[in-house]
Amino acid sequence: IIDCTASQLVDFAHLGSKFMKQLYKIEAPKVGLLSNGSEPTKGNKVVKETHQLLKEDETINFIGNIEAVETWSGLCDVLVADGFAGNQILKNTQGVAMTLIKEIMKYGVMTNQEDVTKQIAGHIMKNYDFESNGAAIMLGAKKYVLKCRGSSGPKATVSACNMLINLINNKTVFEE
């Protein structure tokens, strides 16, 4: 959802928390809210309202606002964002990862360190390549719904199918 209400963002926090509890066995997942500053007064009207609602919700382990620069810091287990901001974070991360890989490979060629740089680039690709990670699980549906990127190729499709098989085999349920 691109234009979310505060209530919908709180629902996302609940869904994300349940997902992390069930799939990753994190007892009290730390939930952050994507904002343009860590202070509760930062963000647009919806973000400020969501911050207050999450702060008051005793069933959520809310740790506060998270800035984009902290997205991958490990501060939170669940990062709540609307569809527009979340998509921008993901695509920016992929772009930065691909740029870093190119720079690392260029450095390896220039310094005759190609073996080492290939290992580093491979590690980055494994963690940030959408083709390897296949799909995103759409939470809140009664059945499994996985969403692949529009530009996904065969590798991403196979990865998504393997993800679905794993969910089914482990009898993963995302509802109470």
Model regions: which residues?
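Short glycine- and Lys/Arg-enriched binding-loop motifs that mark or flank ligand-binding interfaces
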Residues: 28, 33, 39, 60, ...
